[in-house]
Amino acid sequence: MTDRKNLTTNQGVPVGDNQNSMTAGRKGPTLIEDYVLIEKLAHFDRERVPERVVHARGAGAHGKFVTKKSMKKYTMAKFLQEEGTETEVFARFSTVIHGQHSPETLRDPRGFSVKFYTEEGNYDFVGNNLPVFFIRDAIKFPDVIHSLKPDPRTNIQDGNRYWDFFSLTPEATTMITYLFSDEGTPASYREIRGSSVHAFKWINEEGKTVYVKLRWVPKAGIVNLSTEQASQIQAKEFNHASRDLYEAIENGDYPEWDLYVQVLDPKDLDNFDFNPLDATKDWFEDVFPYEHVGTMTLDRNPDNIFAETESVGFNPGVLVRGMLPSEDRLLQGRLFSYSDTQRHRVGPNYLQLPINSPKAPVANNQRDGHMPFKQQTSSINYEPNSYDTEPKENLAFIEPEQEIRGDVAGRLIAEKPNNFGHAKEVWNRYSDAERAALVKNIVDDWSAVREDIKIRNLRNFYQVDPEFASRVAAGTGVNLEEHVADLK
């Protein structure tokens, strides 16, 4: 008898016939006692978990991060203390709005998330390729996503919906200037930049706090597609970015990104005409210089997309010692929402999955729940306790006290909204070709948008730069002058 691998049930019992169901005679009905059939169908019915409400379409890879410059003057995070320190990572890139099998050529921000498996526990970088977002407060997150998702009656994405929302949300204007540039249609995941979008706090061993933003810069350079190029690719292929990333790694052409930090002293927080902790505002490099931190190299593809790329969970609040979230209102909401969605999608024990499990030891009294596979055998499942063998809190790791800004609690309007100043900065920094692409992409997207919605958006664009509004209006046949007289 030859040595062969038997096909088995999930109970380990060898299967003799995987081609025919068990029936009552040659022409009779199928029997419910056919365990092989019932198990196979029942498992198939449950193969999928709910897709992510945002960032459903994604590709990922394993790799390493090497610290190139010590950050000890800013943070006590151990993996950033010494040059040459290597940290395992898993990175996931994604589109934001569209479903799991949608084309990767669609105009959309790109998610850029990295899980660092540090010796002090996991650290999640959760960002996008674009440096700002549509809104500044998490209470509006469901609304902006609903506007961009398909109409719940037709299941068709409708420009009238999201442009209506944008027109009444002037803080979104800077994001529009990025998203409707060609950077809204990147050529590949290997050629996108990454931004933390939010500011975070770094704390060093002396207790000094600074605000930081983080930036990833691809060594391959930033490469984008025109609308026409994206359409040509989409006619042939829905998966071009995932395929490009996978094949590059398989061929040994490992993608790399340099990580940079921008630093702001808290005493300078009020020295700007905008709030630096507002997610709709950028920290431009000439004002906040980049400092090189290290380099990420992705060198191994997942062995199982579902178990790794689909099951990985990120949260911007997953931080190691020496890092804290800032007071950014959008960030504050994400701290809850991101882990909550993984508990819904994957289950309460999603952190026990290998892709999410830290390399650092885990010791606590969080037990049981749906489908646990980590065995916790101690009879002591409470704390404090008098047993020296059980895990105890360590005051060395207590979070440092932080100053609270503001006088009263309440639903307060954001200070220094400056909704158009940064959009003007972006417009001024664009080349003639980049301005032309931005205008064309908006005009094309407005082909079926109602005129009243166009006018409200044009009024916003006019407050960015009259030329910007004038060029978009000319492309859409709107008489701009009669709608902006009160803005002059």
Where are these regions (language model features)?
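Active-site-adjacent core segments of small-molecule enzymes
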Residues: 1-488
